[in-house]
Structure formats: structure tokens, C-alpha cells
């Protein structure tokens, strides 16, 4: 997985109690968004429903980690606010159900389930139900506006989760309890919320295995860990209500085996560790599961943070631990809203002077409605059709658009505040602006070919997982940078069926972001700690630029068409360069005693990939949807198909074709009629047949090279499967 929105926490800085060994802890870079959304939901609850449930202290928030930020660290930034808002809503619902009597709890579930199914009619609902219904309807409206397809899936799974009978207290034994608990821990809800948060599409044929089998250990481990962490809270409620049974694994083992609390906890945590170890094994194998879609594999990988994130949030959350408290800034934000810059400075100073300490009572007091946050107005905690408006400048359905602040208090601030003028210790600039174009193109659907190639080559090279991920991230950063630059240089308007980056952010910002991506790629390579890897990166990157220069030169000087040999040299540098860089870097970091020479294999693959792309551009209906009808003709690209047509067509047709390609300069593109004329000349010269024959020849050569390598280093099923996907 390419991590774009989160950073990893140094494992030496926290104690995971052996409950997530082999799984890192990551935190979303925009964790403040979750805090804002959580406080907004709690304000909306007070306004529309009434006082918060007595057990609702903390919710998403924690003194060290916020729940969504660590369980969904790769949530898209433009969806983090609504996802966090939903998560807090679910926490409050759980609190209501936990403290309600059986009949009332079932009624609450029915209210929510009906609201999700039909959309609550708030004019007929009363009291508490009406308020919850209003918030729920706003949530449904918001997620549907952002992503209607995944929103429908979210609602379906959320309803499925609520269908679980929440009043069940009696189980045959611990195993019977676990079958119930895996669903009761909101696995259906969290599965769907995760796919929505990361904009993943899981094919129907993958769902049973991915949702039910592969990730089952995740929900088992999370449920058991939660049972231990929440024991004190649940036991207090149990004793307060004079109950005779409770839904908790610790209690189940105590009853079944007549053991004490501490022994039951010890056994529960032991079982949790077993489930974690099982899932770590799944993670080690998932990259080779090319029978699953890329999104399915990404989903499975992302679910590891449901284990580590849930654990580390749960260790310190005030929700479970009454001796824990939120930090002072969270206290202030809950009590006073989100002040502007000057108010933050004053408030922080006041808090430091008073030594304010967080108490449970602070959270149950009324909180002022949040009116402004960094210059953005809010309503029901959410503003903007597709996500965040004004928070760190993020706004938009498919990317990030920076909004200028309109707070009049800033006018003349520099001239009024001499201390600020002379202050050389200002906070650094946010990278949100420069990363926005790259984040946008990274969010578009991708086949993940380069990741698949890396996973396949690792069968032979056995690159350690950490270093393999760093190499893959560097390659993906370079690939996305090249796509942004290519689209600017070619004047493309579509990329993967969406507007190209420069048509959203403008050429200047796009070029700047692409350069930043290249620097980030270099930083990833530097982390490998190898001078050889830096040399490989530099050498292959230079080839990429040289190859692109020839392609651009031929387009600009369209009378100077290249030879077939020149074309192949360009492809080897431009397209083959990334594949070659990938193979060389992986070879340099291989832990195998001997490594294959992959030069010919990846070189042939690079040629095949480029020629296939050119061929599909002229013949594939899918490419027409993703990039436009025969877009290469608009760009004036000299593909092998066009070069053959110019040399094989009768002179009058060849001259006509050349004039069409030159004439595209007038409007920057060809009309549909002109493209059809060009296609008729290309087809008349049998250039498409020629291209198909070249592809077939290359494919056979790749297979021969693969078989030769397999004879020395073993069978490589993932590479064969990848080839079958690319075969024309």
C-alpha cells in the first residue's frame, strides 16, 4: 500500500503489550479534522437530542490518539470529517444501548435501522428519536452527495449491523459468544465505513473471502481487546443495574471456567494474540494474491490498523479509563468551540496560567455551537457537499482546493504586531497545498500494475517487506509525477475517466506538485540506506527525462518522425525506465543468495506495456471512456501504429495522414470526423494488424524469458497471472 495520508509511530515510543506484534501504528496527518468533527457531532447531539449519555466521555477522542485517525489512517482527507462524525454518532448510540433497558435498547436500534432503510420522517418522530433522526438524515444526505455507490453499501452494512440482537445476554459457551461478538463489535459497519473512507471498490466475487474469512481475525482480536479494556466500565454498569449477566468475554470465561477476573483477562489477551498472529500471516501472503483485485488487497492490508489503532486508542481513552483525561486544548475546544488564531493564543496562555485540569463534568456541560473554524462556517458539524470546507483549506469532491481566509481580523495584523514581524520561529508551512494535486491523481482508480510487478519479482528476489514497501512507494510517487507532467505536456483533459490534474489545479501547481513528488520519491530511496540505490534512482530518473524529451521533440517537430529503432529506444528509456528502476532497486535490496538478471524480462515488459497502451488507445472502448476517443491522435504522438501507417500507406494516404497530424495544431486536437479519417487510413495500411503482431511477438518473448528465469529460480505464478491480465 502507498501511504499518502499518514505517518508511522516509532514502536519504541509506546507499549503495545504484545497485542499487535508485527503490525505498525500509523496516525492520520489530519487528526485535527477528527477532533473537529467529533466536537461538532456532540454539539449537534446536545442541540437536537439532548444531554449526552452519561457514559459517553471521550468517544473518538483520546489524550494520545483519536480513534479514526489510528484505525483508518489512510482515510481520504476529503472524507475524514464525515467519517469521524459518523464514528462518534455510532459511539453515542452504543452508549445509549449499553445504558438502556432491553426494550428501550431494541427500540433505539429499530429507530436507527428504520431511519437508514427509509430515511426518518422527522415530522412524525418525537423527542429523542426526532433529534437522532435529523442527524442521521443529514449523514445520509452527506455521504450520498460524496459517493452515492459506496454510501448505499455503507447504509446496507450499517443496517445489517443493527439487525444483530443487542439484547442477547445468554450464550452456550465462549465460542458461541465469539460468533456473536465478532458481529456485535460493528464489523459490518466498520467494513463498509472503511471502503467508503478510502474509496475502495471490492468486487462481488471477492467480498465473502475478504470480508468474512481474511479479516475475521481482525474483528476477533479487536473484540477481545475491547472486552478487556472496557471491563471496568462495563462491570460498574453491571453492578449499578444489579444485572445477572453481561456481554463480555471476560465474564464469559469467568462463568464457564469458574476463574477470577485477572485469569480471565489473561486468557482473553492470549486468544487476542493468537488472532493477531493469524492475521499477520495473512498480511505476509496478501501481496501474492493476484486472484484478488487490487482494492481487495489494499482493504485487507488497511485492516491491520483496526488492530493496532483500536488497541492503542483503547489503552488510554477516557471512554474506558476514568483516570485518563483529554489534553487541555481538547478541553478548551469542547467548551469554547474552535477560536481563531488570536483567541487560541490567548486561551492557551490562560490555560497554562490556570493549570486547567480535565474532568468528566467538563464534558457534560453545555458547549457553545461551533461557529467558525479557520474561517469556515459550519452547520450540523458538516459544511460543503463533498467534505471539508475551510479546515486546513480542504474542499472538493475529488481533490483539495485551497480557500482564501476572509476573516477581517487578520487585516493589518502584521503591521500591528511587531513581535510577529521579528519572530523567526514561526510554524512551518503546511504541505497540504503542494500535495493536493498529487493526492488528487493518487485518488483516481488505478490497476496497480507496478505494485503487482514488484510483488511478482519479490518471489525471486525476496526483498524484506519494509524495504519493498519503500521501493514501491518511490515508484508510485514517480509514476504519479510522470502522469501529471505528461498530461500537462500533452494537453490531456481526461485521466482514468476523470479530469486531468492540471485542469483542476492549473498547470503551475501541477508541475510544482510533480516536482515535490519526485523529491519525496528520492527521500524514500534514501531511507533504504544504500548509495547503490541512490545511484540507480538517479540513473534511471535521468533516462526517464531523456526518453520524454525525444517524445516531446517528435510531437513538436511533427515533420521529423522517428524511425522504428528510435521509437524503441525512447520506449526503453521512458516507459521501461520505471520497470527497470524497480527491478534494479529490488535486486540491490534482495535477501536471496543469488538473484536473476531481470534486464531482458523487464525491458521486454516495458516495450509490451507501451505498445499495448498505444494499441488500446486506438481500439478499446474502455480507453475511450477513461482517456477520450483516440486521444493519442489529439496529442500527435508517434506510436508504432502511426509510424507503420506513415510508411506502409500509399503515398496520397500517407500525405493525408501527415497533414491531419500537422493540422491538429490549429485547434489543439482533431475533430471526431478527422479522427475517423485518420483511423480509416491506419486500418487501410493494416497498421493495427501489424501492431497486434508486434505485441504477440513481444508476449512470446516475455514468456520465453520468464520460463528461462523460472528454470533457474523457481516458478513465479504471480508474474504469469499478471501477464495473462495484460495479454491482448
From Swiss-Prot:
<comment type="function">
    <text>Bifunctional terpene synthase; part of the gene cluster that mediates the biosynthesis of the diterpene methyl phomopsenonate. At first, the universal precursor of diterpene, geranylgeranyl diphosphate (GGPP) is provided and is cyclized by the unusual bifunctional terpene synthase PaPS to give phomopsene. The C-terminal prenyltransferase domain of PaPS catalyzes formation of GGPP, whereas the N-terminal terpene cyclase domain catalyzes the cyclization of GGPP to phomopsene.</text>
</comment>
<feature type="binding site">
    <location>
        <position position="575"/>
    </location>
    <ligand>
        <name>dimethylallyl diphosphate</name>
    </ligand>
</feature>
<protein>
    <recommendedName>
        <fullName>Phomopsene synthase</fullName>
        <ecNumber>4.2.3.-</ecNumber>
        <ecNumber>2.5.1.29</ecNumber>
    </recommendedName>
</protein>
<keyword id="KW-0460">Magnesium</keyword>
<feature type="short sequence motif" description="DDXXD 1">
    <location>
        <begin position="94"/>
        <end position="98"/>
    </location>
</feature>
<feature type="binding site">
    <location>
        <position position="486"/>
    </location>
    <ligand>
        <name>Mg(2+) 4</name>
    </ligand>
</feature>
<feature type="short sequence motif" description="NSE/DTE">
    <location>
        <begin position="226"/>
        <end position="234"/>
    </location>
</feature>
<feature type="binding site">
    <location>
        <position position="574"/>
    </location>
    <ligand>
        <name>dimethylallyl diphosphate</name>
    </ligand>
</feature>
<feature type="region of interest" description="Prenyltransferase">
    <location>
        <begin position="328"/>
        <end position="728"/>
    </location>
</feature>
<feature type="binding site">
    <location>
        <position position="479"/>
    </location>
    <ligand>
        <name>isopentenyl diphosphate</name>
    </ligand>
</feature>
<dbReference type="GO" id="GO:0016114">
    <property type="term" value="P:terpenoid biosynthetic process"/>
</dbReference>
<dbReference type="Pfam" id="PF00348">
    <property type="entry name" value="polyprenyl_synt"/>
</dbReference>
<feature type="binding site">
    <location>
        <position position="98"/>
    </location>
    <ligand>
        <name>Mg(2+) 2</name>
    </ligand>
</feature>
<feature type="repeat" description="3">
    <location>
        <begin position="393"/>
        <end position="398"/>
    </location>
</feature>
<comment type="subunit">
    <text>Hexamer.</text>
</comment>
<feature type="binding site">
    <location>
        <begin position="230"/>
        <end position="234"/>
    </location>
    <ligand>
        <name>substrate</name>
    </ligand>
</feature>
<feature type="binding site">
    <location>
        <position position="490"/>
    </location>
    <ligand>
        <name>Mg(2+) 4</name>
    </ligand>
</feature>
<feature type="binding site">
    <location>
        <position position="98"/>
    </location>
    <ligand>
        <name>substrate</name>
    </ligand>
</feature>
<feature type="binding site">
    <location>
        <position position="94"/>
    </location>
    <ligand>
        <name>Mg(2+) 1</name>
    </ligand>
</feature>
<feature type="binding site">
    <location>
        <begin position="181"/>
        <end position="184"/>
    </location>
    <ligand>
        <name>substrate</name>
    </ligand>
</feature>
<feature type="binding site">
    <location>
        <position position="226"/>
    </location>
    <ligand>
        <name>substrate</name>
    </ligand>
</feature>
<keyword id="KW-0677">Repeat</keyword>
<comment type="pathway">
    <text>Secondary metabolite biosynthesis; terpenoid biosynthesis.</text>
</comment>
<dbReference type="GO" id="GO:0046872">
    <property type="term" value="F:metal ion binding"/>
</dbReference>
<dbReference type="InterPro" id="IPR000092">
    <property type="entry name" value="Polyprenyl_synt"/>
</dbReference>
<feature type="region of interest" description="Disordered">
    <location>
        <begin position="352"/>
        <end position="379"/>
    </location>
</feature>
<feature type="binding site">
    <location>
        <begin position="319"/>
        <end position="320"/>
    </location>
    <ligand>
        <name>substrate</name>
    </ligand>
</feature>
<feature type="binding site">
    <location>
        <position position="610"/>
    </location>
    <ligand>
        <name>dimethylallyl diphosphate</name>
    </ligand>
</feature>
<feature type="binding site">
    <location>
        <position position="490"/>
    </location>
    <ligand>
        <name>Mg(2+) 3</name>
    </ligand>
</feature>
<keyword id="KW-0511">Multifunctional enzyme</keyword>
<feature type="repeat" description="2">
    <location>
        <begin position="387"/>
        <end position="392"/>
    </location>
</feature>
<keyword id="KW-0808">Transferase</keyword>
<dbReference type="InterPro" id="IPR033749">
    <property type="entry name" value="Polyprenyl_synt_CS"/>
</dbReference>
<dbReference type="InterPro" id="IPR008949">
    <property type="entry name" value="Isoprenoid_synthase_dom_sf"/>
</dbReference>
<feature type="binding site">
    <location>
        <position position="617"/>
    </location>
    <ligand>
        <name>dimethylallyl diphosphate</name>
    </ligand>
</feature>
<feature type="repeat" description="1">
    <location>
        <begin position="381"/>
        <end position="386"/>
    </location>
</feature>
<feature type="binding site">
    <location>
        <position position="496"/>
    </location>
    <ligand>
        <name>isopentenyl diphosphate</name>
    </ligand>
</feature>
<feature type="binding site">
    <location>
        <position position="486"/>
    </location>
    <ligand>
        <name>Mg(2+) 3</name>
    </ligand>
</feature>
<feature type="binding site">
    <location>
        <position position="98"/>
    </location>
    <ligand>
        <name>Mg(2+) 1</name>
    </ligand>
</feature>
<dbReference type="GO" id="GO:0043386">
    <property type="term" value="P:mycotoxin biosynthetic process"/>
</dbReference>
<feature type="region of interest" description="Terpene cyclase">
    <location>
        <begin position="1"/>
        <end position="327"/>
    </location>
</feature>
<keyword id="KW-0456">Lyase</keyword>
Amino acid at each position: 500500500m502507498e501511504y499518502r495520508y499518514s505517518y508511522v509511530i516509532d514502536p519504541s515510543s509506546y507499549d503495545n503489550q504484545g497485542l499487535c506484534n508485527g503490525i505498525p501504528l500509523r496516525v492520520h496527518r489530519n487528526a485535527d479534522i477528527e477532533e473537529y468533527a467529533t466536537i461538532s457531532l456532540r454539539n449537534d447531539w446536545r442541540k437536537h437530542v439532548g444531554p449526552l449519555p452519561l457514559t459517553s466521555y471521550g468517544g473518538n477522542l483520546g489524550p494520545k490518539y483519536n480513534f479514526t485517525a489510528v484505525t483508518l489512517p489512510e482515510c481520504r482527507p476529503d472524507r475524514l470529517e464525515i467519517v469521524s462524525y459518523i464514528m462518534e454518532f455510532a459511539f453515542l448510540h452504543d452508549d445509549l444501548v449499553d445504558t438502556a433497558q432491553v426494550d428501550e435498547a431494541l427500540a433505539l436500534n429499530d429507530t436507527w435501522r428504520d431511519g437508514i432503510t427509509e430515511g426518518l420522517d422527522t415530522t412524525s418522530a418525537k423527542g429523542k428519536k426526532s433529534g437522532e433522526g435529523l442527524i442521521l438524515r443529514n449523514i445520509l444526505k452527506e455521504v450520498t452527495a460524496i459517493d452515492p455507490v459506496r454510501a448505499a453499501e455503507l447504509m446496507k452494512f450499517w443496517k445489517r449491523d443493527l439487525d444483530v440482537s443487542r439484547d442477547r445476554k445468554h450464550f452456550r459457551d465462549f465460542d458461541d459468544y465469539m460468533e456473536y461478538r465478532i458481529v456485535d463489535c460493528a464489523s459490518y459497519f466498520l467494513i463498509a465505513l472503511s471502503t467508503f473512507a478510502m474509496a475502495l471498490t471490492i468486487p462481488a466475487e471477492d467480498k465473502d473471502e475478504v470480508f468474512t474469512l481474511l479479516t475475521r481475525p481482525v474483528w476477533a482480536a479487536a473484540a477481545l481487546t475491547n472486552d478487556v479494556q472496557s471491563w471496568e466500565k462495563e462491570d460498574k454498569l453491571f453492578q449499578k443495574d444489579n444485572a445477572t449477566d453481561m456481554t463480555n468475554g471476560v465474564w464469559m470465561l469467568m462463568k464457564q471456567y469458574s476463574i477470577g477476573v485477572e485469569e480471565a483477562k489473561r486468557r482473553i489477551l492470549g486468544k487476542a494474540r493468537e488472532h493477531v498472529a493469524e492475521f499477520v500471516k495473512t498480511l505476509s501472503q496478501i501481496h501474492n494474491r493476484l486472484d484478488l483485485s487490487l482494492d481487495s488487497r489494499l482493504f485487507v492490508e488497511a485492516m491491520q490498523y483496526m488492530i493496532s489503532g483500536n488497541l492503542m486508542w483503547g489503552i488510554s481513552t477516557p471512554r474506558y479509563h476514568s483516570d485518563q483525561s483529554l489534553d487541555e486544548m481538547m478541553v478548551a475546544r469542547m467548551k469554547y468551540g474552535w477560536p481563531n488564531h488570536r483567541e487560541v493564543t490567548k486561551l492557551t496562555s490562560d490555560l497554562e496560567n490556570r493549570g486547567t485540569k480535565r474532568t468528566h463534568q467538563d464534558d457534560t456541560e453545555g458547549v457553545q455551537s461551533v461557529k467558525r473554524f479557520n474561517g469556515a462556517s459550519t452547520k450540523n458539524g458538516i459544511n460543503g457537499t463533498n467534505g471539508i470546507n475551510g479546515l486546513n483549506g480542504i474542499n472538493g469532491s475529488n481533490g483539495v482546493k485551497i480557500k482564501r481566509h476572509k476573516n477581517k481580523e487578520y487585516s493589518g495584523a502584521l503591521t500591528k504586531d511587531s513581535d510577529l514581524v521579528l519572530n523567526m520561529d514561526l510554524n512551518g508551512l503546511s504541505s497540504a497545498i503542494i500535495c493536493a494535486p498529487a493526492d488528487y491523481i493518487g485518488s483516481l482508480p488505478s490497476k496497480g500494475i507496478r505494485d503487482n510487478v514488484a510483488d511478482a519479482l519479490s518471489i525471486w528476489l525476496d526483498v524484506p517487506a519494509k524495504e519493498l514497501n519503500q521501493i514501491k512507494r518511490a515508484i508510485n510517487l514517480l509514476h504519479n509525477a510522470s502522469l501529471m507532467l505528461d498530461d500537462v505536456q500533452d494537453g490531456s483533459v481526461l485521466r482514468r475517466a476523470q479530469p486531468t490534474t492540471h485542469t483542476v489545479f492549473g498547470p503551475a501547481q501541477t508541475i510544482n506538485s510533480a516536482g515535490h513528488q519526485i523529491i519525496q520519491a528520492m527521500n524514500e530511496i534514501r531511507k533504504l540506506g544504500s548509495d547503490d540505490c541512490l545511484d540507480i534512482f538517479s540513473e534511471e530518473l535521468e533516462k526517464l527525462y531523456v526518453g520524454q524529451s525525444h517524445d516531446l521533440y517528435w510531437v513538436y517537430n511533427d515533420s521529423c518522425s522517428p524511425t522504428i529503432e528510435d521509437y524503441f529506444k525512447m520506449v526503453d528509456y521512458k516507459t521501461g525506465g520505471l520497470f527497470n528502476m524497480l527491478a534494479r532497486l529490488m535486486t540491490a535490496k534482495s535477501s536471496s543468495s543469488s538473484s536473476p538478471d531481470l534486464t531482458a524480462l523487464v525491458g521486454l515488459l516495458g516495450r509490451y506495456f507501451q505498445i499495448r497502451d498505444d494499441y488500446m488507445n486506438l481500439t478499446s472502448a474502455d480507453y475511450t471512456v477513461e482517456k477520450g476517443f483516440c486521444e493519442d491522435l489529439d496529442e500527435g504522438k508517434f506510436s508504432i501504429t502511426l509510424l507503420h501507417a506513415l510508411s506502409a500507406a500509399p503515398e496520397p494516404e500517407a500525405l493525408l495522414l501527415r497533414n491531419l497530424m500537422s493540422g491538429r495544431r490549429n485547434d489543439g486536437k482533431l475533430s471526431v470526423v478527422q479522427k475517423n479519417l485518420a483511423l480509416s487510413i491506419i486500418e487501410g495500411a493494416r497498421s493495427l494488424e501489424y501492431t497486434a503482431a508486434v505485441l504477440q511477438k513481444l508476449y512470446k518473448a516475455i514468456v520465453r524469458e520468464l520460463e528461462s528465469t523460472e528454470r533457474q529460480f523457481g516458478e513465479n505464478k504471480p508474474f504469469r497471472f499478471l501477464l495473462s491480465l495484460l495479454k491482448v
